[in-house]
């Protein structure tokens, strides 16, 4: 529910997940692609599988491809990946964070449209 956790290993991640669940948290993102357990957990055999980098990235790539097919742009696919269809403010924040991270790591640049959209 909005608290970032950076466990050092799988066991710590599993313990953090169990603690969050026992504390009533429902919306918990797992793994390197931050897949939400509440909405996507049924696509995996277990929480351990959600934490497996190969399975996590494979699922995320397939999910993004489905979103891209539905929404026709990668920006909208990325927006929906994180926040779902009824949360425009969260979608905008997420897309802008993704763009900023891509620029910071040398995988893109700010375009005029992106700057305008993200108020940069």
What does each of the following model-derived ranges do?
Residues 4-120:
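Non-catalytic cell-wall polysaccharide-engagement segments
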């Amino acid at each position: 529910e909005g608290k970032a956790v950076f466990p050092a290993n799988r066991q710590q991640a599993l313990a953090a997940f169990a603690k969050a669940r026992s504390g009533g948290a429902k919306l918990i993102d797992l793994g390197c692609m931050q897949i939400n357990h509440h909405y996507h957990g049924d696509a995996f055999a277990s929480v351990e599988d959600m934490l497996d980098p190969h399975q996590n990235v494979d699922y995320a790539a397939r999910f993004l491809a489905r979103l891209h097919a539905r929404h026709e742009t990668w920006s909208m696919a990325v927006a929906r990946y994180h926040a779902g269809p009824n949360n425009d403010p969260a979608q905008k924040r997420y897309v802008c964070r993704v763009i900023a991270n891509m620029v910071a790591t040398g995988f893109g640049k700010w375009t005029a449209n992106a700057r305008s959209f993200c108020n940069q």
